[in-house]
Amino acid sequence: MAFSPKRVKHRKVQRGRIKGEATRCNNIDFGDYALVSLEPFLLTNRQIEAARVALNRKIKRGGKLWIRVFPDKPYSKKPAEVRMGGGKGAPEYWVAVVKPGTIIFELAGVDKNLAEQAMTLAGSKLPFKTRFAEQIQAD
């Protein structure tokens, strides 16, 4: 289940740079537990899928999982050993821009211990530092 947009307005985009903390997608809105990024990174569709598979295997059909990031930015690359010039390379894969504080996954319907184990396992599949977070219950 590779994540990629069905259609895009522009086939190629500029790389840009990731500045600052996340101002959106930084609250636990759906589940009870979350995996939060601590570093800026361009997260690929394959990395999201690897973490999702690891999470689902750990929770074993229990609970509900939300994927809060989507790779909507094309990452283009020129082939190896090609001289400079000749235009921008072809889009290779899709990336999601992840800022520090961005929630990547949310989980509900499982106990805290299992959720923490599953999120830690999913975080180990990702190439940047993450932490486990839980929803604060308002009494």
Swiss-Prot record:
Transmembrane helix in keyword set: no
GO biological process, one term: translation
GO cellular component: cytosolic large ribosomal subunit
Top-rank lineage group of the source organism: Bacteria
Keywords on record: Ribonucleoprotein, Ribosomal protein, RNA-binding, rRNA-binding, tRNA-binding
Entry-linked HAMAP family: Ribosomal_uL16
Name of the featured protein: Large ribosomal subunit protein uL16
Organism: Treponema denticola (strain ATCC 35405 / DSM 14222 / CIP 103919 / JCM 8153 / KCTC 15104)
